[in-house]
Amino acid sequence: MVSAVLLIQKATPETITQFHDQLSNELPTLRGKWNFNFKIFRNNPYSIPQELAETATVAPESKWLYTLSPSYLSDSSISLINGKSVGVFTNLIKEEAGEHGHSVELSIPNSHLHKGATTDLNDPFDFFVAQKLQSLWTQRQLIRGDGGRIYELENGNLTIRTSNVFLHGNFRGLLVQIEINQNLCNVDDVSSFASTFETIRNKYGIPAGDLSCEVLDPKRLDTYADLIYQYSKILNF
């Protein structure tokens, strides 16, 4: 899947209701509700690499760590460090996922579990960073997405997720996450993604806003890496 994230900061209750009504008129398949947590961490400036300890009193540069935990990825989180390195972490065990009806796309294989090849974490990765790595990373912001809805259109080739965005309890806009099948775009030309998503925005009456369809590596598209990269661009308050 290829994604784009749109934030409509000037959204009002009226425009949100109108948008949902318009999507409903397209007779989509409703895939339930969702929410997300997006956390932003900054490196501790006094945590200095050993090789610089004798020449520097603070870290020479600021680094940022982002974590995204959408509810549709059960017990999983995506992390991005400094816009370069991405990791996907899950506590979901494959043999248990099937029993509870969860997707096994992001899960710990049974063989890994039996051989001890896991992170051995009981807590979500973002919680682990906040609680166990305080000497390295300091949480700066927690952005929540609540009241989300999932619409599936065009025979499953298009998914539109909407969510109200809150920072410190204050409404900051309507987030629209658009996901399309790769056969609906030219994956060999990432510069064409913007026009593709703009066409979708106009077709389904999605209000205008700040849109990011940037990818982490144009030569190697990655669903989750590109998604959190787009979140880091859009939810940078």
Swiss-Prot record:
One GO biological process term is: regulation of transcription by RNA polymerase II
What InterPro entries has UniProt attached to this entry? Mediator_Med20
Could you tell me where this protein is found in the cell?
Nucleus
Which key words tag this protein in UniProt? Answer: Activator, Nucleus, Transcription, Transcription regulation
Annotated Gene Ontology cellular component terms: mediator complex
Query: GO molecular function terms here?
Result: transcription coregulator activity
Superkingdom as given in the UniProt entry: Eukaryota
Query: Subunit comment for this entry?
Result: Component of the Mediator complex.
Q: What exactly does this protein do?
A: Component of the Mediator complex, a coactivator involved in the regulated transcription of nearly all RNA polymerase II-dependent genes. Mediator functions as a bridge to convey information from gene-specific regulatory proteins to the basal RNA polymerase II transcription machinery. Mediator is recruited to promoters by direct interactions with regulatory proteins and serves as a scaffold for the assembly of a functional preinitiation complex with RNA polymerase II and the general transcription factors.
Q: Which family does it belong to?
A: Belongs to the Mediator complex subunit 20 family.
Listed name of the protein: Mediator of RNA polymerase II transcription subunit 20
